[in-house]
């Protein structure tokens, strides 16, 4: 049992779903407000007579919910499989909404809320706090469902850049987990968070563990996600050859389904990025064009394309790409870099204007705050400083680069 008194939980859910206040139910049943409140909190168990009165008001039957309980258990099992195999799980929200009136009378209703919570977390929806609080108030900390809850709570914390909290939650989830597939998912999420914390070797170890489990159970899309993350670790460590090999291996293994085409586009973009870091801008440009066929108008691909054309001194083509993608000026993720690249293209290979230098500093400093500053950000800034003859600032940023 996940509560001392599941009937109280069922009464509360049905009452709220039907839009009744406690006072309204009290007046309709003749049961005092205080006693109803105790029923819902689970501090007092209602008699059969009281349950019957409440059922009549809410127009429900709590006596026979076994079929619905089992249906919800089956739905949760199916949902967990969809996560493990990286299937589209958005349809669960529509399914839940169309069956909520049936589900809400079940003592397993918290599992429905958990499915909704995870789908919303994965979709990066902001409004999940209410769901999170409701689940936390009803789920038992010894249950395997609690492991799933704190795992995706950690995923949400990671998206908010609360890395320490995310790590702590995942360590707790690892202790509770007793299923190999669950372990694989936790390893995967732990590897991603460790990567964000720049703990690259720990991230690598966890991703390798996760990949082993995904391969064992034929979850090749998840396995590919591990390869992408491992490739990113190689990039961070400056092992561009290993990164390209890892990405290329996975690219060859992918099929032509919609999900795998999206993954191919990501791989092409990542390979383009590696070639940019290796200063092979022609090779990078070819890879970007392949990515564009699969996923046009991607912000990163657009920026990579502008940069490659700029470095190849094809300013006319670069400017055309800028004109065709003015929407990035309004995108908070890409805006500052898009403006910087626009300035660079307008300056061509001549002495950079002050606005270009200021924008390069702005981009670099912002990325530094977010812990995203990388080789290219330094390269752009240092190139501009060299052309501007800003000796003092050049030395300052070169010292920072040496430390990084």
Q: What is the role of each PLM region?
A:
Residues 1-17:
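A short, Lys/Arg-rich alpha-helix, primarily the initiator
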Residues 18, 122-123, 160, 190, ...:
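Structural motif corresponding to the intra-repeat A-B loop/turn of tetratricopeptide repeats
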Residues 19-38:
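Short alpha-helical DNA-recognition segment
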Residues 47-64:
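DNA major-groove recognition helix of helix-turn-helix/homeodomain DNA-binding modules
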Residues 96-101, 133-139, 171-176, 208-219, ...:
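Amphipathic alpha-helical segments of tetratricopeptide repeats
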Residues 111, 148, 185, 225, ...:
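Residue register of alpha-helical TPR repeats
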């Amino acid at each position: 049992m996940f509560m001392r008194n599941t009937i109280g939980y069922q009464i509360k859910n049905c009452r709220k779903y039907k839009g009744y206040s406690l006072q309204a139910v009290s007046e309709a049943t003749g049961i005092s407000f205080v006693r109803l409140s105790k029923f819902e909190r689970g501090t007092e168990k209602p008699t059969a007579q009281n349950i019957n009165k409440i059922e009549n008001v809410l127009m429900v039957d709590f006596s026979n919910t076994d079929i619905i309980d089992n249906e919800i258990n089956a739905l949760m099992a199916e949902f967990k499989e969809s996560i493990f195999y990286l299937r589209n799980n958005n349809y669960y929200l529509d399914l839940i909404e169309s069956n909520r009136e049936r589900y809400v009378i079940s003592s397993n209703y918290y599992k429905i809320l958990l499915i909704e919570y995870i789908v919303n977390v994965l979709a990066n929806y902001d409004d999940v706090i209410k769901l999170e609080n409701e689940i936390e108030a009803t789920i038992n900390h010894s249950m395997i469902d609690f492991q799933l809850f704190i795992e995706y709570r950690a995923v949400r914390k990671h998206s908010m850049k609360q890395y320490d909290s995310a790590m702590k939650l995942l360590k707790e989830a690892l202790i509770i987990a007793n299923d190999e597939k669950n372990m694989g998912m936790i390893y995967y999420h732990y590897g991603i968070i460790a990567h964000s914390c720049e703990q690259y070797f720990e991230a690598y170890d966890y991703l390798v563990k996760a990949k082993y489990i995904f391969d064992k159970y034929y979850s090749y899309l998840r396995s590919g996600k591990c390869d992408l993350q491992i490739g990113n670790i190689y990039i961070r460590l400056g092992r561009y050859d290993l990164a390209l090999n890892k990405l290329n291996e996975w690219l060859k293994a992918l099929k032509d389904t919609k999900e795998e085409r999206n993954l191919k586009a990501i791989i092409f973009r990542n390979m383009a990025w590696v070639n940019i870091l290796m200063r092979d801008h022609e090779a990078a440009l070819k890879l970007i064009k392949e990515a564009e066929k699969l996923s046009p108008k991607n912000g990163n691909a657009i920026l990579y394309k502008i940069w490659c054309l700029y470095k190849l001194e094809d300013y006319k083509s670069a400017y055309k790409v800028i004109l065709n993608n003015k929407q990035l000026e309004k995108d908070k993720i890409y805006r500052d870099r898009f403006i910087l690249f626009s300035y660079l293209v307008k300056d061509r290979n001549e002495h950079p204007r002050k606005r270009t230098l200021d924008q390069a500093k702005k981009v670099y400093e912002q990325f530094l705050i977010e812990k995203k500053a990388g080789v290219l950000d330094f390269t752009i800034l240092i190139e501009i400083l060299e052309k501007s003859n800003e000796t003092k600032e050049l030395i300052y940023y070169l010292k920072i680069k040496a430390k990084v």
